[in-house]
Amino acid sequence: LNLKMSIKELFNGDDEPMNIDGIDSKNGLINIIFNEDGIANYDIALKDEKTIDDGKSSPLSLKIQNYKVENFKLRYFDESSKIKMVIDSLNHEGTGDFTAQKLDLVTKSTAKVSLDMDKVNYMKNVALTLDAILGIDLEKSKYTFKENKALINQLPLEFDGFIQMVEAGQEYDLKFKTPTSSFKNFLGVIPSAYAANLDNVKTTGDFTVVGFAKGLYSDTTVPKFNIDIVSNNASFKYPDLPKSVQNIVIDTRIINETGILNDTYVSLDNLSFKIDQDVFNAKANIRNITQNAIVDAALKGTINLANLSKAYPIKL
């Protein structure tokens, strides 16, 4: 942990804030574990200890100009819900006046995220980028998205709404969407190891992601949410490959209407595409996703691996 400040700040009066030019930390590791009783590994304070307030101390006032963390790693595991999350290669920096009760915090963040739920992998080293101005109300513990730009791998997203810390957990009221409707957005969400360079890929058609999350995140609940993923009559062609993928239709919804995680369901109303004369169609519904998933699917069509390798840059 590095601290940058003028030596004269050590001699400020009791009513003067201590001006800190910057705080930074590198190569840190945070390991958080909740056992089956919901007790965290950092909860080590003695419950029966009582502190005596003599009324003589005053809170320390800090005026921090900027802070930065580089190459941090966060591991989270909940033994009861079997949720495991790893945030790796976390780089984050922010600037703002932390002496104010309300401030605009200018932030830049990058990370790679992996997520497993009950031994099922949902995300693996997904690259996240977020440049955002957050309106912070320290008195209400409320964080509001103002100007922001996010990338999931190469999929752009914009957020609107707020997150607020409350006694029972965190209250969410967020909306998000893709700022543009290009089908290249869909290729952008695929990990770069499987999608290759997108700079010269020719695409037609649209692709949009629109959704919201609203409600309480706590030990027993998640915010209710709805995510619509839609594409109509799209196509793409990589410049170094002879074939293209055409007539792409995607109509998918990921929905939670109760706030109970296991009630989340996926409705794939339509997935279809064509490579040469090979046409593929699929429909599916997936429920009970965090326990013993129930899948109802109908698949019809032809997938010729030789044609697929001529249209999509992946070794089969």
Language model features with spans:
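Amphipathic hydrophobic-ligand
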Residues: L1-M5, S80-E93, N121-D131, K149-G161, ...
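Transmembrane beta-strands of outer-membrane beta-barrel proteins
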Residues: K108, K146-N148, D160, K175-K177, ...
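Secondary-structure transition motifs
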Residues: L1-A100, F159, I163-E167, E171-A196, ...
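Outer-membrane beta-barrel proteins
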Residues: I7-N12, A213-S218, N256-G259
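Transmembrane beta-strand segments that form the barrel wall of outer-membrane beta-barrel proteins
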Residues: K142-K149, V266-L271
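Sequence/structural signature of outer-membrane beta-barrel proteins
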Residues: Y76, S114-D116, A234-K237
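Extended hydrophobic secondary-structure segments that form protein cores and membrane-embedded regions
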Residues: D21-S25, Y67, N226-S231, D269-L271
